[in-house]
């Protein structure tokens, strides 16, 4: 046969694989290598029983990399090559948690001088659990409380599709690209019984050995070392360039299932942990367990406290959970924490150091806090140079002085504090003293016939510490009210320290939420006297902001002998101004903050004792800023979660002319707090006998107050004028300030809507929404979750986290999930975002 014949050529072509055949083979081999490498990783990280040497794994890994390089379109979502990182991101996207990531209540077991634990708080926890279960006997699971970052991992059809940080518990950041670089997180779940959807909660951390190695590299590269493994893990996980994250070895340990569809259904938490391991996750084997009673739990806790230094990772306690998931459900939640779990913290770590100086810090409310400046000491995983001394009483009680050797503790492993002084190490000096000669004469007696020999005694080198009498910042007097532990600077907003801290709080995210205006800018504005009051922020313009930045940059340039930031030097040596987009962004943020929710505005004012929760209570009780400004102290004291002390603080704030003027200035500058629906009508809580019993300076029980109210004809005018009332009442009301208070109460109640009026929708309450319970689920087209919640609450509705028979509406967005299914099963009305907005009007 002629080898060059046409038939022979066709036969050769038939033997040559087509492009589609090559691609099919590549796809099959990529799938094979991906599965094989993931299995080897599972054996290595989860089972701790590798079946192949590292060199074999590396060879297969490089083979997979080469295939993916030639066929990037065939790269699988669970490919282990993703663990080396990808291209940098522009920023982290927000992620709304379908199930909030809640915190745990803390419990402490202090040790005495002999190392004996006091477990009273844990026994109290056990009793609360038993009471909640009507005497039932719970089993407990105890597991390490890792000192890392809480992370939520979402798997769909077994593949990791999203990873999010905890954030504020409701909203976190999307860190999926970085999480994929964590070696012991499965990119595809193992096993045959993988769920259709599962959200796994756990902790990302850095092992101690990896932390030491990282800091060594940082030092070798001339970079700042990390303070502790937690900071290193946090900094690594929040890198926009995931290739940097990949270089820093992070670990993950799971601790709970947030939600799940299909797959194995656990009845106990210990079964959940076993399920995690079956799915390919690592567990802290040997460091957790299930126990029959609280005494066994506490014995294991003490064992782990002793074992803590030997662990490969940092832990700051143990988490104790009721094992039965049914019992967990029965116990439920309180506020933002489960009743069925507690974080049992270890005793804080302590170390010795020397007090080099004591000075004071001035807080935004004027609180004067003495602070010990310390010789640097490594304690609780960080280098400590400052420690709080709390107040003058604490300084005096502990007798802390400059030069003292002290025990420093990181209280709760967060805030360093001075625990006690080692008095035998106190620096002393010798001083001459006058002593008796034994006959009754003294050494300093000029008429003594036989003077005694000179004698000396040791006295402390430094005098006892006393707070300064005047503020070191503004020189205003430091005052301390009777019965108060904390002394305060009397300068108010005249004090630069209070002014800066007050403005930082005012602009903060949970207050007015002024986007773009950070602490550094505010500190510069205050230091340069460009802003003195809240309203001054709303008068800022681009020239003022430019002046602030130029002055700040000039200071930096003079100290560094470098051209200032924000300018450039051309060939001629002349400075060219940069664009002012940054200033425009700040002004846009200020403008956007002009219509805050009433609760945010009240919180922003910085009223003493008024946190977010109290501010929300005030908004829900009074509805408008004007009503809050005029609310009498006895009415405030009747509201939920407020009480006498907080009520007095609120009333005192609004009684000051300068505070009212400050609010008027804000209103004049265009700030307009939104009207809030009255969902906690004062009439419901401030019944006559209750507010009468809370009148300042008049002691009376609620029963007697009720009798007084009836004697007065059940009206305030009778209380003001009836001459047949008891003489002690008549004496009280004759005082001018008390007469004014009664008049204020009469006017206030006359102008407040009744409970019925509030329920019927007066004062802006939406009749269709007031009193209704809403549940939000899924991603809405235009509204963020907190925006939708604010709109509902402003109209008088309530937002719940779970669907029940008491739910009136479920507002469903994209990927609504199990809440939508439950709503349909219970026959609860389901609304789209558009339908919600229509309902809200």
Curated annotation (Swiss-Prot):
The active site is at 145 (n6-amp-lysine intermediate). DNA ligase that catalyzes the formation of phosphodiester linkages between 5'-phosphoryl and 3'-hydroxyl groups in double-stranded DNA using NAD as a coenzyme and as the energy source for the reaction. It is essential for DNA replication and repair of damaged DNA. Residues 561-570 have a biased composition (Polar residues). The gene is ligA. Residues 554-575 are annotated as: Disordered. The lineage of its organism: Bacteria, Pseudomonadati, Pseudomonadota, Betaproteobacteria, Neisseriales. Its EC number is 6.5.1.2. It comes from Neisseria meningitidis serogroup C / serotype 2a (strain ATCC 700532 / DSM 15464 / FAM18). HAMAP family: DNA_ligase_A (MF_01588). This is DNA ligase. It is an enzyme of class 6 (ligase). Residues 764-841 form the BRCT domain. Keywords: DNA damage, DNA repair, DNA replication, Ligase, Magnesium, Manganese, Metal-binding, NAD, Zinc. GO terms for cellular component: cytosol. Belongs to the NAD-dependent DNA ligase family. LigA subfamily. Gene3D superfamilies: 5' to 3' exonuclease, C-terminal subdomain, 6.20.10.30, BRCT domain, DNA ligase/mRNA capping enzyme, Helix hairpin bin, Nucleic acid-binding proteins. The keyword Zinc applies.
